[in-house]
Amino acid sequence: MTRPAVIQPGTADTYAHQALALIAQHRLLTSTQLHQMLMPHTPPRKIHKVLAPLRAEGLIAHTALGVRSGLKAHFLTAAGAQVAADWPELRGRAATVIASPTAASMRAAHTLAGVRAHLAFLTEARERGDEYQPLDWMPEVTHRLPDTGGQDRLTADAVLHYTATQPRRLQYRAFVEIDRTTMSSERLARKLITYARFHDYTPQPAGRRGTAADQNAALSAWQRFYPRFPRILFILTGAPRATLTARITDLRRMAADHGLVTRLASHVPLGAAILEDLEEAGPSGPVWTPLAGTGERRGWTHL
């Protein structure tokens, strides 16, 4: 009996699919970043052959990054978002359509700083043989927070899902906050209060007054999404080292002085690192300052 031929998509089609999925999830990616994620062991020019048909079909567009640099950041068009909307790897993640190259350029600095951090984790995972893929960094994850005094939602810049395979198999999750020093240090530190409230928040059963038994039986809000509360990582860039170090000190002070955050720190690893250190030494290098306890720097899994 003759078996029917199995039709496999060509390599070019597979790369095009993956590139569109990556742009859909990460919002904005440079050609270099796409090359690092998708085909790091091939000549850089090959990524342009992947992107050209997507651009010709109107699925992606780009914005120039600086007048002299020649760098471009690619983003999804409405047509591209429609194509990728039902893909399994993007399920539950509505693709963000950026209206124009101007709109893309205005959000590029923050978005691409996050991608740089993601690539630091991805590069190290590949070197170590850990399980962490280009889609394991999920940008702009939002959770509703009814009890936060008007700030009714928590939006993390990203959530990462990482599985270390050596010396034993361990799964890690982290909320990631990217700080480019565009907000005050106090406002940055206040994000810890929002995370602490999310950690403590237990929704009341609808239509019930909430007896002690009900409260004990109810899940905390975060347990609806995570088996363990993710560690919280602040990644700073965009200013002299002295400024970034001072902001990390302010984060540590918030963890020490605010009772709600102090309680969070007793249950959840909290740390901060400078992006350039992260890129140079890798996430497992001694680049993370714990936000509670001793300030001795360490790797992110040892916070």
Where do the model's predicted regions map?
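Nuclease-adjacent, charged terminal/linker segments that flank catalytic cores
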Residues: M1-T102
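Electrostatic, structured charged patches in enzyme active sites and in nucleic-acid/phosphate-binding
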Residues: T2-H17, S100-L303
